[in-house]
Amino acid sequence: MTNTRKIHPLIKIINHSFIDLPAPSNISTWWNFGSLLGLCLAIQIFTGLFLAMHYTSDTMTAFSSVAHICRDVNYGWLIRYMHANGASMFFICLFLHVGRGMYYGSYTYSETWNIGVILLFAVMATAFMGYVLPWGQMSFWGATVITNLLSATPYIGTTLVEWIWGGFSVDKATLTRFFAFHFVLPFIIAALVMVHLLFLHETGSNNPSGLISDSDKIPFHPYFTIKDILGAVLLILILMILVLFSPDLLGDPDNYTPANPLNTPFHIKPEWYFLFAYAILRSIPNKLGGVLALIFSILILMLFPLLHLSKQRSMMFRPLSQCVFWILVADLITLTWIGGQSTEYPYNIIGQLASILYFAIILLILPTISLIENKLLKW
């Protein structure tokens, strides 16, 4: 008799995705981040749901409702800090997941890759709106500065900003709509994740060698389920250490001051995971140019399938490309550091150089190095 999991209309979908899925036998720990991102999304949705039960999206009470959650709600402090630090874990996993895709050439599955880039945009939008909700100083001024960037749009800019604000400044209408969007976007992200997996399972997973692995596949369960569980345990361990020992390590002290439109913080900056893009934005003196550079810094990922000129898929056997890749990683870390500094000498110069290097590596240096490697291999 055929096993129920193989014939039941609903269960067989799960079976083909997580149980009997043929997976390459040599995928490393770098392939764990997909499942960890799923876990992060689940944690964020559940903690967010419980926070939404106690939060009020009104400028008069938003800040005190967050304080109320931390002080008066049973384990409210735990839920709030799991949600805040869960976002940081989410982005750490996202950056590592994207980095793995770049290193091992997973972007050659262009549909999966492009859906992934759209997911990255959606998660960044969700995180930005979530940062506004506690209605502290950095929430208010971050929202003002970032939404104001849209005014750089030719002709319709000012109208567009006022339309998003729901008035002539960031106020009650802005907070209410940001809360609404912040609540609904994770469910849209979950739907996009399904599409991401659908396209992935059409082609099967890539592997570190970048070679076709059809002749050497093993079932996902139990081999990779146990591997994913280990990753999940480590992720939760790191998250809980962060939450229980230093929950405000990655936050901004300014956000413990209620929003005040009459008092600008000394240094307005977003959360740490946006600092690299913020540094690119600030490195261009022109407003519209900065906004375009900011958008293109993420959108450029969609060009990876087109810019792949190497005869080999993975960087595993391409030492020159590996060097350039790690320079790119160092450059992104530099941009993150610069984004957190004030705009003065020498930080502004370093930021401009790092921004130029970022685009140069992706658009020029990596494709050129790939062609050189092809020549060295007499291909």
Curated annotation (Swiss-Prot):
Binds 2 heme b groups non-covalently. Keywords: Electron transport, Heme, Iron, Membrane, Metal-binding, Mitochondrion, Mitochondrion inner membrane, Respiratory chain, Transmembrane, Transmembrane helix, Transport, Ubiquinone. The keyword Transport applies. The keyword Nuclease does not apply. A ubiquinone binds at H201. Heme 1 (or BL or b562) is low-potential and absorbs at about 562 nm, and heme 2 (or BH or b566) is high-potential and absorbs at about 566 nm. This is Cytochrome b. The gene is MT-CYB.
